[in-house]
Amino acid sequence: MKKLLSKVGKIILLAIGIIIIFLIICMLIGFTLHKTYYKSQLESIKPYGEMVNVDNKNMHVYSMGEGENTIVLLPGHGVPLPSADFAPLMRELSKENRVVTVEYFGVGFSDKTDKPRTNENYMNEIRTSLNKAGIKPPYILMPHSISGIYSEYYATKHPEEVKGIILLDSTSTALTSKVFPKDIVSTYKAAKFQQEISLQRLLLSFISDETLEKNGYSINNGYTQKEIDDIKKYMNYSMNNTIIEQLENTFTSVQEVKDLPIPESVPILKIIASENNDKRQEEHLKRLGNNASSVVLDGTHFIYHNQTEKISKLTDQFIDKLN
C-alpha cells in the first residue's frame, strides 16, 4: 500500500512538474510573440497625424478641419488609441472648427515616458506638443474623464491660453477621498503581465463585434472599419508603466487642483453622462464656480461614442456665447 501511494505521489509530482514546464514554455512563447510578431503588426499602422518632439520623445498630435476656434480633445485614462477613439467626434466638430487630439505619453502612437505623471508635466506636454505642431492658443479644451483635472490645472496656470473648457464626463476635482483603491492599480499591473505574455490578446479574442458595438465602436456611430480594427490591435498594448503611474497619481492630482481657483475668464460646460449623474457632479459644479453650467446626456462614461451630434450642437452653442 505504501509503495502504491509513493508511486501515485511521484506520478502527481511529475504531472505537476510537466504542467509548470508547459506553462513556462507557453509564457516564453507568448512573451516572444508579443515583443516581435505582434509588435510589428502594431508598428505597421501609420500615425494618423503628426509626431512631434517633446522632451526628446515622440508625441502624436492629430488635427482635422479649419476654423476660427481650436478645440483640443484630451483622452481619458488608458484609452488605447485616442486618435481613433475620438475620430467620429472630431469629424463632427471639424465641420466648423479646427479640432486636435493630443495623445499623451503612454497611449496611442506616442512614446512611453519615465517622467513623473504630474499635473504640471501633463500641462507642459500638452502646450509643447501643440506648439511644436504649429497650433497656437487660445484653445477650447475638451477633456474626457481624468483629463478634466489637467485642463482645470492648465486654466488656472495659463488662463490667457484657454478660451473655454467643455468637460466630457470628467473626473470631479471636488473629491476628498481616494479616487481609485489600491486593488484597481493591482489589477492594472496584473493586466500588464497578461499583456506581456500574450494572454490579454487571447482573452480579447473572445470579445465579439457585438460587444464592441455595445461599447460604441460601430459603423453606425461614425467609426470607419480601419479605426475599429486599429483600436482592437491597440487594446493588446494598452497597459504600460506610464499609464499605471497616471492612475496611481490621480488622487494626488485631484488634491493639487481642488483648491486652485478657476479663473472667471474661463467659461466651463460640463457634459455629464446619465449613468454618472450623482452628488459628485453637484460638488464639482460648485467648485467650478458661477461661470460653469452643465448638461446631462443619456449614455455611459464614454459619452462621446454615441452622442457626437448632441455634443457638437452643445459645442456650437457654447462657442456662440463666447463670441
Where are these regions (language model features)?
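Conserved HGGG/HGGXW glycine-rich cap/lid loop of the alpha/beta-hydrolase fold
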Residues: 57-109
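Conserved hydrolase catalytic core segment
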Residues: 137-180
